[in-house]
């Protein structure tokens, strides 16, 4: 037996913790934390360690599957599957154009550079009418839109300088469980405790006393009250002259406009909307301005409310007004460091702003965010007749039946497709409706470089990995599947023909066009890179894996003073004044709740769940795990509900039934339900099917008028609900 210990890194979530894979005769047998990793330093969570069970899961799809006439699946060869998929796709494309084709791309896809880049090339080949839906419209798309408004580029994203701050305010995030989101900080819990150890503070503002709040200071807030709080903080910062107006004028335009908009939102005025005492708000504003190194950070809770783009915009505005943007210990910007980066970002920003302004979804007229449409309207794009009706859907690394609002609507719509193809590890609740399910390689069966997360690291860091093992069974990397489809269609699609010509031209010089070729160029041109031989000993993909298998730190901290290079607008200053923001603030003033739904629903993360896709790992499901709804003890008492009772949670859009967990660690009038559950036996994962649970997104609306206008985001927090005991 040949046993090998291979350094690599985890790609389940954003800290990208270093791992050591134990491989026996080509089979992954265990994973453990990498003690020699410069940043994670021997830490990994339960999910990372349990991933061996995913790789070797007997329920995993390891051969291509084709739907039978009886409704089940049968094995099929790759060539037969791809030939039929390409023929049917080409026929539908010929009859209806690229507007008949849709692609849903799930969250794990962002953790594979090759998946991301190959899909981008596929999208370019089919042109702008191709429908692309992503998990981003349930997660992060309004971060991109807020950045586009403020900095001119959706990719200019500030991150809190956790390693140097003395006051970290966390709103709507739970990093002790999530390990950080749109923020790459290994061992983030330890780094937050370091803040306190050096005499600083960590304040968590959340409707629930989360696992993070339990370890630091907690300030409860009414769900989806964050925009009111942030506006009142701006009111105090400007009103008490806590703003360095000269610095603000150097960094941004539109400050006077913003000050006027915030003027009506005094802490006394917003108290009814936030539940926070006015003196507490004033004290917080003074502390943010008076602490030399302070940062406000928000994530899913601030993104998935009724006005998430506004809230995200206001997070940056508060950091700016308090003097904490682009400052050590504040909120800072990462950069790749390649020559001409600002001009490249300037061109890309102009392109994406133009697409955002000009391209609209067929259903609802939503703008295009990073070339994508809201997943919330995917069902209606399938069922609504007319030019551009989706007739083919490809799904990779996703389970939208469980992750988009009103999954039942989507599940019913899938039956009307002419062709549906899934690329994934399991037959999940969505892929159960496919004509073909194609087996994908896991993260340990492919090379990788965490491309999307390079600018989200307070400690600039590079790590790449080769595949630890060969793909199990007949699994293939997603990019190879996408490339195969493109190769088979190039004669019938002009855009793909141009891609084929580029591929053939490079082949004449012995160069294979692949995602690795592109990402290697990014590494070589960026900070620490070899600049294609101009910098002796610099980094390349191969040199990273061979000489730095545990990764390498490029610098201890991010550089400050880069805002002018990050902003791609002419004049190099942020733009605060936007009609869209004024309209959103007006909408906030006019918020009304439906009668008969007195409580507010929020989401919550679980340490042993990763969205909808890791409920089949025995290690994570041990102890007969059950999904619960968390409810305040006073609310339970008033409704004659006791711990463990079954309750019905109803919204204007649906209802689910769950056992209740009574607690004091939540604001009264609020209930919390973890997402990702609702496995109802239609998928091919037996442990997940046995776990069951309820799909909380059945309580959410997919109606276009209920999606956030600027980013097409689903409203997943602050949802009005009613909770009633279920008669035994």
Question: Where are each of the predicted segments found?
Answer:
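Extended redox/cofactor-interaction regions of prokaryotic respiratory oxidoreductases
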Residues: 116-193, 198-205, 212, 227-231, ...
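Flexible, glycine/charged-enriched surface loops at secondary-structure junctions
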Residues: 96-100, 243-248, 295, 326-333, ...
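Short glycine-rich or small-residue beta-strand-to-loop segments that form or flank ligand, phosphate
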Residues: 101-107, 170-172, 295-305, 394-396
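N-terminal export/assembly segments and adjacent metallocofactor-ligating motifs
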Residues: 1-240, 254, 277, 368, ...
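Long, contiguous, secondary-structure-rich segments that constitute the structural scaffold
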Residues: 467-468, 472-532, 536, 612-630, ...
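Short beta-alpha connecting loops at secondary-structure transitions
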Residues: 214-221, 448-451, 460-471
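Active-site phosphate/pyrophosphate-binding segments
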Residues: 233, 251-375
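C-terminal, active-site-flanking charged/polar segments
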Residues: 416-419, 423-448, 453-461, 486, ...
């Amino acid at each position: 037996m040949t046993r090998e210990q291979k350094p690599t890194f985890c790609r389940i979530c954003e800290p990208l913790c270093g791992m050591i894979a134990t491989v026996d005769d080509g089979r992954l047998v265990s994973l453990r934390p990498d003690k020699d990793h410069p940043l994670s330093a021997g830490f990994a969570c339960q999910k990372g360690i349990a991933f061996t069970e995913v790789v070797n899961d007997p329920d995993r799809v390891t051969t291509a599957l084709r739907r039978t006439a009886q409704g089940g699946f049968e094995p099929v060869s790759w060539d037969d599957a791809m030939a039929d998929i390409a023929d049917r796709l080409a026929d539908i494309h010929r009859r209806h154009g690229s507007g008949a084709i849709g692609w849903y791309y799930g969250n794990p896809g962002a953790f594979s550079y090759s998946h991301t880049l190959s899909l981008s090339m596929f999208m370019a080949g089919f042109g702008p009418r191709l429908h692309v839906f992503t998990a981003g419209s349930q997660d992060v798309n309004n971060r991109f839109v807020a950045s586009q408004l403020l900095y001119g580029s959706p990719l200019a994203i500030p991150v809190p300088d956790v390693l140097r701050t003395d006051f970290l305010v966390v709103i709507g995030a739970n990093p002790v469980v999530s390990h950080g989101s749109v923020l790459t900080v290994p061992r983030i819990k330890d780094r937050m405790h370091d803040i306190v150890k050096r005499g600083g503070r960590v304040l968590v503002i959340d409707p629930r006393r989360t696992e993070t709040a339990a370890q630091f200071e907690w300030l409860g807030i009414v769900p989806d009250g964050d925009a009111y709080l942030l506006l009142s903080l701006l009111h105090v910062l400007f009103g008490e002259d806590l703003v360095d107006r000269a610095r603000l004028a150097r960094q941004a335009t539109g400050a006077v406009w913003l000050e006027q908009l915030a003027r009506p939102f005094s802490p006394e005025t917003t108290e009814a909307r936030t539940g926070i005492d006015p003196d507490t708000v004033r004290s917080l504003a003074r502390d943010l301005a008076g602490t030399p190194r302070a940062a406000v950070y928000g994530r899913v809770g601030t993104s998935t409310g009724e006005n998430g783009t506004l809230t995200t915009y206001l997070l940056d505005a508060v950091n700016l007004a308090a003097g904490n943007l682009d400052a050590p210990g504040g909120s800072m910007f990462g950069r790749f460091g390649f020559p001409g980066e600002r001009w490249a970002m300037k061109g890309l920003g102009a392109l994406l702003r133009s697409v955002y302004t000009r391209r609209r979804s067929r259903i609802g007229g939503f703008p295009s965010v990073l070339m994508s449409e809201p997943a919330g309207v995917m069902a209606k794009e399938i069922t609504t007749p007319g030019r551009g009706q989706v007739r083919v859907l490809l799904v990779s690394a996703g389970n939208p039946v469980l992750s988009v609002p009103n999954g039942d609507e989507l599940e019913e719509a899938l039956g009307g497709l002419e062709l549906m193809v899934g690329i994934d590890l399991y037959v999940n609740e969505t892929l159960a409706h496919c004509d073909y399910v194609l087996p994908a390689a896991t993260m340990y069966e492919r090379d990788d470089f965490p491309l999307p997360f390079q600018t989200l690291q307070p400690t600039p860091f590079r790590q790449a990995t080769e595949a630890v093992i060969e793909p199990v069974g007949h699994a293939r990397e997603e990019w190879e599947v996408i490339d195969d489809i493109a190769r088979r269609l190039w004669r019938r699609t002009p855009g793909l023909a141009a891609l084929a010509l580029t591929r053939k031209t490079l082949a004449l010089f012995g160069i294979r066009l692949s995602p690795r070729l592109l990402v290697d160029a990014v590494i070589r041109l960026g900070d620490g890179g070899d600049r294609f031989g101009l910098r002796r000993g610099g980094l390349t993909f191969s040199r990273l894996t061979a000489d730095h298998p545990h990764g390498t730190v490029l610098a201890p901290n991010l550089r400050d003073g880069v805002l002018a290079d990050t902003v791609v607008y002419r004049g190099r200053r942020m733009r605060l004044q936007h009609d869209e923001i004024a309209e959103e603030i007006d909408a906030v003033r006019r918020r009304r709740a439906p009668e008969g739904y007195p409580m507010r629903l929020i989401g919550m993360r679980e340490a042993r769940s990763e969205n909808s896709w890791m409920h089949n790992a025995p290690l994570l499901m041990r102890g007969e795990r059950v999904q619960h709804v968390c409810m305040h003890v006073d609310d339970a008492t008033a409704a004659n509900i006791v711990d463990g009772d079954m309750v019905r949670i109803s919204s204007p859009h649906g209802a689910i039934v769950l056992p209740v967990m009574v607690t004091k660690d939540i604001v009264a009038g609020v209930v919390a339900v973890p997402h990702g559950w609702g496995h109802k036996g239609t998928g091919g994962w037996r442990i997940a099917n046995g776990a069951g649970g309820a799909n909380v997104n059945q309580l959410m609306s997919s109606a276009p008028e209920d999606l956030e206008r600027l980013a097409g985001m689903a409203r997943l927090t602050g949802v009005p609900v009613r909770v009633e005991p279920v008669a035994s």
